[in-house]
Amino acid sequence: MSSVAIIAASGVGKRMNLRNGLSKQFLEIGGYPVIYHTLAAFQRASSIDKIYIATKPDSIATLETLAEEHQFSKINAIIAGGKERQDSISNCIELIALHIEKAEIDRPDTILVHDGARPFITPDEIDQIAQLSHHYGACVPATKPKDTIKYISDQPGFFGETLDRSLLLQVQTPQGFASEKLVEAHRKAREAESYATDDAALVEKFFPDQKIKVFEMGYHNIKITTPEDIFLGEAIYAQLQQQS
């Protein structure tokens, strides 16, 4: 089985209140940039053959230097992302297709799409998701919500119905898919000018018969989004270091 990873690392970190265009992926946890931890996990995952990264144009050189310094040999391309996250993933998919056509890489069985700002995914979890994606055609990691979730009422400032928490999961990444399904879903989305919140939603829309396997995760695989996440991330990093 062969797998390719796409890392979405174009986020500008608006909720981080960062200045001077700094990307949240370059904030440090444990003395290393967030994106370093992410890439290190995929570099060590035995299921991953190649890594493609979509980032801001002014971050490409920084990531190229990072890859060289830490010998992230699986990184095959670092390219400019698009206007939306989905556009960034599509850019990578088109490049992967071109590399396959030119026989520069073998056609992967699965493609995994991951948020660059989720630094605590482990190589073993990546490998398990890749295997399940290959077996079922699609696999998405998720956690059970800790908090009660409610609809917002039609009347501003008031709650509506309370959702049954036992029927809900909070979706994460990496999301894995049979490569032909993900490529075709993005092609159809481009043609229809259709956008979705994540790749699983695209596959659900264009391949409604494709069931998506749940990979239940722990609560360590957080996305660095707000300033508080840095402090939480330091604690998670310390715990993972003790376990390794």
From Swiss-Prot:
It catalyses: 2-C-methyl-D-erythritol 4-phosphate + CTP + H(+) = 4-CDP-2-C-methyl-D-erythritol + diphosphate. This is 2-C-methyl-D-erythritol 4-phosphate cytidylyltransferase. Pathway: Isoprenoid biosynthesis; isopentenyl diphosphate biosynthesis via DXP pathway; isopentenyl diphosphate from 1-deoxy-D-xylulose 5-phosphate: step 2/6. GO terms for molecular function: 2-C-methyl-D-erythritol 4-phosphate cytidylyltransferase activity. PANTHER family: 2-C-METHYL-D-ERYTHRITOL 4-PHOSPHATE CYTIDYLYLTRANSFERASE, CHLOROPLASTIC (PTHR32125:SF4). It comes from the Bacteria. Catalyzes the formation of 4-diphosphocytidyl-2-C-methyl-D-erythritol from CTP and 2-C-methyl-D-erythritol 4-phosphate (MEP). Pfam families: IspD. InterPro entries: IspD (IPR001228), IspD/TarI (IPR034683), IspD/TarI_cytidylyltransf_bact (IPR050088), ISPD_synthase_CS (IPR018294), Nucleotide-diphossugar_trans (IPR029044). Belongs to the IspD/TarI cytidylyltransferase family. IspD subfamily. Its EC number is 2.7.7.60. The record marks R15, K24 as: Transition state stabilizer. The record marks R165, K223 as: Positions MEP for the nucleophilic attack. One of its GO terms (biological process) is isopentenyl diphosphate biosynthetic process, methylerythritol 4-phosphate pathway. HAMAP family: IspD (MF_00108). Keywords: Isoprene biosynthesis, Nucleotidyltransferase, Transferase.
